[in-house]
């Protein structure tokens, strides 16, 4: 399959047939098997909170996953990342830790380094691979090297604007990449500091907003098309993509649109024909593998107006809130969230 090509979204009866086709999990997914069951009595510690800009999202994710795991019969403790954490882990020796931390320290590999230092099993990608995925330009470089497509971009540190003057640099950006553009921090999630720039006079304000969340900005050519989020899960049988979720919003898909119910419309599975859905899913799996990710990830892409799947970014700690995309995809696949999360935990239970 050529993962850089595709066809426009199906409509009418064809779209309905395609959605019906992918909603049958036995046809496309082989995620959960009898040997994935976790023995009763397991103790899971969920790390949620932290000090990043995404603290509240992390806490909401932690509560949701804890509810599902408890319903699946596991003992669950939620703990913040603070001075009590390491003594707590030493005293309680949980079977596995699940870091549901978003933003710095949670996704940049730091907390995973610490968990490995103290010998605690955990759900998710390792430290080195997390660091690569956390950096948007590094992740784009890796997936481009793997033969996938991604919008043209440039990275610019804040210091460069002080040294060269902002306007000449921004003029050069527009001359090279054109308009519209997307400005985003090179690190971070939840669309914090992200701006869609339609006119050149909007670019200076977008840079100021971006630099509020980091010292380096990634400016990429904006792509028009169908916005999709594709979650990948690996329970030890190889990575498999859940049904892509189509994201439709009247304005930018910003923080409020992501986490306030009713601001955004989601279609799970996406309203695309079966062949295109397969291509989109393959792109997400290839990105997951190229970056060396483990257990779960979410890849954000756009199916552009030429039918090309454009990689935007990847998340090693996908949100698990009531409006988050991985849970929506799992439900679209007919999967029980408690069983899915329990199976992810089982892969790392302390033996």
Where are these predicted regions, by residue range?
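Glycine-rich phosphate-binding loop of ATP-grasp-fold ATP-dependent ligases
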Residues: 58, 151-155, 180-205, 227-229, ...
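ATP-grasp fold ATP-binding core
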Residues: 143-144, 173-191, 215-224, 228
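Phosphate-binding site of ATP-dependent enzymes
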Residues: 198-282, 303, 308-310
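ATP-dependent carboxylate activation and anion-phosphoryl transfer catalytic cores
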Residues: 1-25, 31-32, 36-39, 273-351
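ATP-binding N-terminal substructure of ATP-dependent carboxylate-amine bond-forming enzymes
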Residues: 1-138, 157-169, 343, 347-351
């Amino acid at each position: 399959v050529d993962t850089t090509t595709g066809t426009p979204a199906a409509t009418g009866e064809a779209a309905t047939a395609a959605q019906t086709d992918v909603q049958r999990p036995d046809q496309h997914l082989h995620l959960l098997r009898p040997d994935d069951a976790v023995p009763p009595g397991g103790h899971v510690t969920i790390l949620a909170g932290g000090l990043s800009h995404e603290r509240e999202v992390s806490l909401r994710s932690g509560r949701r996953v804890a509810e599902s795991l408890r319903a699946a019969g596991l003992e669950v403790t939620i703990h913040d990342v603070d001075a009590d954490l390491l003594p707590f882990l030493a005293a309680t020796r949980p079977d596995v830790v699940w870091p549901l931390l978003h933003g710095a320290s949670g996704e940049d590999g730091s907390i995973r380094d610490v968990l490995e230092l103290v010998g605690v099993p955990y759900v998710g990608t390792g430290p080195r691979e997390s660091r690569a995925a956390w950096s948007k330009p590094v992740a784009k470089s890796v997936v481009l090297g793997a033969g996938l497509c991604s919008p043209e971009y440039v990275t610019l540190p804040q210091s460069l604007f002080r040294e060269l003057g902002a306007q000449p640099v921004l003029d050069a950006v527009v001359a090279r990449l054109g308009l519209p553009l997307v400005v985003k921090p090179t690190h971070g999630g939840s669309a914090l500091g992200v701006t869609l720039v339609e006119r050149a006079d909007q670019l200076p304000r977008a840079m100021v907003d971006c630099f509020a969340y980091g010292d380096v900005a990634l400016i990429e050519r904006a792509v028009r098309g169908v916005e999709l989020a594709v979650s990948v899960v690996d329970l030890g049988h190889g990575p498999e993509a859940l049904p892509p979720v189509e994201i439709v919003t009247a304005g930018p898909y910003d923080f409020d649109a992501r986490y306030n119910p009713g601001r955004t419309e989601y279609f799970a599975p996406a309203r695309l024909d079966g062949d295109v859905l397969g291509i989109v899913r393959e792109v997400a799996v290839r990105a997951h593998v190229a970056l060396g990710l483990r257990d779960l990830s979410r890849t954000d892409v756009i199916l552009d107006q030429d039918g090309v799947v454009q990689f935007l970014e990847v998340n090693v700690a996908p949100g698990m809130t009531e409006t988050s995309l991985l849970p929506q995809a799992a439900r679209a696949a007919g999967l029980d969230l408690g069983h899915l999360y329990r199976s992810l935990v089982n892969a790392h239970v302390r033996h």
